[in-house]
From Swiss-Prot:
GO molecular function: ATP binding; DNA binding; endonuclease activity; proton-transporting ATP synthase activity, rotational mechanism
Protein name, per record: A-type ATP synthase subunit B
Primary location: membrane
Gene3D superfamilies per UniProt: 3.40.50.12240, Hedgehog/Intein (Hint) domain (2.170.16.10), Homing endonucleases (3.10.28.10)
Complex and partners: Has multiple subunits with at least A(3), B(3), C, D, E, F, H, I and proteolipid K(x).
Source species: Methanopyrus kandleri (strain AV19 / DSM 6324 / JCM 9639 / NBRC 100938)
């Protein structure tokens, strides 16, 4: 949409709610659907949006650039009174626009001939002219078997990794209405594509000259997702102007967004600090699904709602997102395994997108396009909702029976509240042990908790009323505080690394040879819990300390688990890691290495390190796993860990000298390019910022700046040019909450599971998974529906999606009295080749057929991999035959279809019984099917076949079969077009 002078309108600051990409503005008068809105942020930035819903006294506004940074108090919303319009002109031909309709090709400003509402209107059925004119695409499988007709809506159903982009570009280059070539134009709109895809389309159109008669509209994957809702409408508005105001025949090609899914077992990090496998989130949410849950053996997905909030990025830092919908999808046969330098390993669908670093900054790239050396964005410091559990909470979660022996003050407080202890027990329906002496009276832990809630305000206070806790035996545990502190968490780290917990037999053990660690363990356990440890020594001189207590066994079962520690404050995480390093780590050569025998435990330790802002590498060796921290990160970690092992503490103290950088110190490639732009814009010399050669190498990409060097450059730049926007962006790149994790291996693998899983999160559409990798999900229509809290339809899409799609597709057609026409070919990438996915499924109901791309044909090297059997053009009969293509076209197409179908059936039979069991007739049909695919379906990417060439090729293939088998073609047509008779006729004429 072109920039225009800001229109006058009513301004409001009465925002009551911000949800995903939407905001609710109260007290609005006279707002109308589709009205353009300007949103001014607290920093003065102006964003654009439109009214999605107008109520009596409120309006729901969809913000195109997203709602990040908006608040409900100081954000201003201006209702312009205008609908979303774009300037149109025949000068748009040959131009490249972004998803908002703004030129991005560096060409001259477009002088508008008119301004049109992008929502337009479907063609009035009474004014429609029935489509009947052939459009030649130059592709035999379409022209010969599934003919495109002027004014038709004919979608292409594809899948991830199939060459739909190449096919779309070829159709755009070659398509024409025979005899009216000068009046034919293409409007090509791509939504949610990668930069590589955008570069491909630009190159294809520019180098072949096709751009001269085309308008190219590109919405990139890292553009605001809300643009994807308006991009196809902008494309159709341009097409309507060219068709119905300038008498052109316009082919509109629309590419669609994809879906992204994970393998089960992928670990998702939640805002509460839990690490939950994605399939667990989906299955748990499905229990509350609106239509009864996930049905086994079906690709139909039920949408559930969950209270899970995930960590999300990317706007330079972490946020939290609501999980609003879930999916469980039958898995494809293939997936992509991605391994990174840090040790992260993910198995995802081929179209799943990761946040990758480039010279232009972060952008989303599909897994199938990743390559070794790419750098993925990962979180440097995990920030979660912190919580330290009380000892009572830890014990209440266990199945064991524990007994609380209260203080006298407890029963006095209960009696004061209820009149007597007996009355309190009756009201709470608890047993009253009247015969027991007060000093021997006890309560089961759950009983005590129920009584305590009546006389205390917090769980912490309950500990004050506890004398001691037992597990039914004599071993008493006295808690010195309600919750574990740094000392206890240090012991938990010792136990996790070099100890054990046995909840069955009820003991905790720690073994080591270092006296300082043994003493620390004994002293802390005695001081914090009032228990003693027994000591033994084995034949190797290793001292083993054992605490016999079922109570402490249950406490340390939880506290020694890194997943529990992940939610705790930074100082407790550091204390735990100090115990772990003292017990089973070593410091040497500027590295800190923590060793474990368990792969999952190693991943948990990496997450704990990221709670401290420390990235690490996971390495496997001889059945063990090392978590390694190097460079500046190791030195900073050494300073923060309260180590007690004498030698390790000494090594940590000396680690601050001779610090070296690691790969995780690198800043984004964007830093160098932006630095050069800033220097040129403000006339800053390289020598003003440091070594000229260093600055030059960073700007050219020869050298990568470390975080520290980048920050030094930024600080010097601030002294020279001040606090300007570009320098603020450089600072964000220098000290942002990210690390770059290099991809070391990408491989296509056979998928081993039955299902893939997906969650829809709003508003940021990203998840933090595994050890901090940032990855994507969500589709725009589903996002809006979730943000509006609408009753979800299939797979999280709104129930009105059929209507929404129809408002796009029904803008195609021919109008009586108008020469021009609009033909649509939307391209839909079916998630996991699932034709029942809501978008292709509903598209099939609205449109007039479909072209289906085959993964099997693609694997066999056939381009374009069009499977003609499930493909269909419902208007084909109206656009072919005598006077349109050729008289033999209808019968020839039917015969080719029937023969190919029989050949395909025989191919399946051969797989069972072998070719030897076939008759001679069967072998001819089998040969026909092979030749049909290799000669008719397959053609060059630049091969433009005329309809005559396509039909003649069809007759050549039918010559493989006996004439008696050509039952769908008349004898007259056989005598006229069959190669045998045509050859005789040509010989006679000669």
């Amino acid at each position: 949409m072109a920039e225009a002078e800001r229109p006058a309108g009513k301004e409001y600051t009465t925002i009551s709610e911000v949800s995903g990409p939407l905001m609710v503005v109260e007290g609005v008068e006279g707002a109308k659907y589709g009205e353009v809105v300007e949103v001014e942020t607290p920093t003065g930035e102006v964003r654009r949006g439109q009214v999605l819903e107008a109520r009596r006294d409120a309006a729901v506004v969809q913000v195109f650039e997203g709602t990040s940074g908006l608040d409900t108090t100081s954000t201003k919303v201006r209702f312009t009174g205008e609908t979303l319009r774009i300037p149109v002109s025949t000068d748009l031909l040959g131009r490249i626009l972004n998803g908002r309709g703004e030129p991005i090709d560096g060409g001259p400003e477009i002088v508008p001939e008119d301004e049109l509402d992008i929502h337009g209107a479907p063609i009035n059925p009474a004014a429609r002219k029935y489509p009947s004119d052939f459009i030649q695409t130059g592709i035999s499988a379409i022209d010969g078997m599934n003919t495109l007709v002027r004014g038709q809506k004919l979608p292409i159903f594809s899948g991830s990794g199939l060459p739909h982009n190449e096919l779309a570009a070829q159709i755009a280059r070659q398509a024409t209405v025979p005899g009216e070539e000068e009046e034919f134009a293409v409007v090509f709109a791509a939504m949610g594509i990668t930069h590589e895809e955008a570069a491909f389309f630009r190159r294809e159109f520019e180098e072949t000259g096709a751009l001269d008669r085309a308008v190219l509209i590109l919405n990139l994957a890292d553009d605001p997702s809300m643009e994807r809702i308006i991009t196809p409408r902008i494309a159709l508005t341009v097409a309507e102007y060219l068709a119905f105001e300038n008498d052109m025949h316009v082919l509109v090609i629309l590419t669609d967004m994809t879906n992204y899914c994970f393998a089960p077992g992928t670990r998702v990090i939640t805002a509460s600090g839990d690490v939950v496998e994605i399939d667990e989130i989906v299955e748990r949410a499905a229990e509350t699904a609106v239509d009864g849950g996930l049905r086994e053996g079906s690709t139909e997905v039920t949408v559930g709602v969950t209270n899970v909030r995930t960590l999300a990025a990317w706007d330079g830092d972490l946020t939290s997102n609501d999980v609003v919908a879930v999916e469980k999808i039958e898995a494809p046969s293939r997936a992509v395994r991605v391994r990174t330098r840090s040790g992260a390993e993910l198995v995802v669908s081929e179209d799943h997108k990761f946040l990758v670093d480039t010279e232009d900054g972060p952008r989303m790239v599909e897994a199938s396009e990743l390559k070794s050396g790419d750098e993925l964005y990962s979180v440097r410091e995990l920030r979660v909702s912190e919580k330290v559990p009380t000892y009572l909470e830890l014990l209440l979660e266990a199945e064991d029976k524990f007994y609380v022996h209260p203080t006298e003050e407890f029963e006095e407080a209960v009696a004061e509240r209820y009149g007597s202890l007996a009355e309190a027990c009756r009201e709470k329906e608890l047993p009253y042990r009247a015969r027991e002496a007060k000093e021997r009276r006890y309560y089961e832990l759950s009983e005590f908790a129920r009584l305590a809630t009546a006389v205390i305000e917090s769980v912490d206070e309950a500990t004050e009323y506890i004398d001691y806790v037992t597990a039914g035996g004599r071993k008493r545990v006295k808690f010195s505080s309600p919750r574990p502190g740094k000392e206890v968490m240090y012991v938990a780290g010792l136990i996790a690394s070099d100890g054990s917990v046995d909840t069955e037999r009820g003991f905790v053990m720690f073994s080591n040879t270092e006296r300082e660690l043994l003493s620390a363990f004994e002293e802390i356990v005695t001081e914090e819990f009032g228990v003693d440890a027994s000591k033994t020594e084995n034949q190797n001189g290793v001292t083993m300390l054992r605490v016999n207590s079922r109570v402490l066994a249950r406490v340390f079962e939880r506290l020694a688990d890194p997943k529990t520690v992940l939610k705790m404050p930074r100082e407790l995480v550091a204390a735990y890691l100090a115990g772990y390093v003292d017990g089973d780590g070593h410091l040497k050569d500027g590295k800190i290495v923590i060793t474990t025998a368990d792969r999952e435990r190693a991943g948990d330790l990496q997450l704990l390190l990221k709670r401290l802002g420390v990235p690490s590498v996971l390495r496997e060796r001889d059945g063990a796993y090392d978590v390694v921290v190097t460079g500046h990160d190791a030195a900073e970690l050494a300073e923060e860990l309260p180590l007690r092992h004498p030698k390790k503490a000494e090594a940590a103290a000396s680690m601050s000298s001779g610090r070296r950088s690691s790969r995780f110190d690198r800043v984004s490639r964007r830093f160098g390019r932006l630095l050069r732009e800033v220097r040129r814009k403000y006339g800053v010399r390289a020598s003003d910022l440091g070594s000229s050669s260093t600055i030059s190498q960073i700007e050219s990409g020869e050298r990568r700046a470390t975080r520290r060097l980048a920050l030094e450059i930024v600080e010097r730049l601030e002294e020279v040019v001040g606090d300007v926007e570009e320098v603020r962006e450089l600072r964000e790149l220098a000290e942002g909450n990210y690390v770059l994790d290099e991809v070391v291996e990408v491989e296509t693998v056979e998928y081993e599971h039955e299902y893939l899983y997906d969650v829809t999160v709003v508003p940021d559409h990203t998840l933090v998974v595994e050890n901090g990798i940032i990855t994507s999900n969500c589709e725009a229509l589903r996002e809006i529906s979730a943000a509006r809290e609408e009753v979800p339809g299939r797979r999280g899409y709104p129930g009105y999606m059929y209507t929404d799609l129809a408002t796009i597709y029904e803008r195609a057609g021919c109008i009586r009295g108008r020469k021009g026409s609009i033909t649509q070919m939307p391209i839909l990438t079916m998630p996991h080749d699932d034709i029942t996915h809501p978008i292709p499924d509903l598209t099939g109901y609205i449109t007039e057929g479909q072209i289906v791309l085959s993964r099997d044909l693609h694997r066999r090297g056939i381009y374009p991999p069009i499977d003609v059997l499930p493909s269909l053009s419902r208007l084909m009969d109206e656009g072919i035959g005598k006077g349109k293509t050729r008289e033999d076209h209808p019968d020839l197409s039917n015969q080719l279809y029937a023969a190919y179908a029989e050949g395909r059936d025989l191919r399946d039979l051969v797989a069972v019984v072998g070719e030897e069991a076939l008759t001679e007739r069967d072998r001819k049909f089998l040969k026909f099917a092979d030749e049909f695919e290799q000669r008719f379906v397959k053609q060059g990417r630049d091969e433009n076949r005329s309809i005559e060439e396509t039909l003649d090729l069809g007759w050549e293939l039918l010559a493989i079969l006996p004439e008696r088998e050509l039952k769908r073609v008349s004898d007259e047509l056989i005598e006229k077009y069959h190669p045998k008779y045509r050859q005789k006729k040509e010989e006679q004429e000669e």
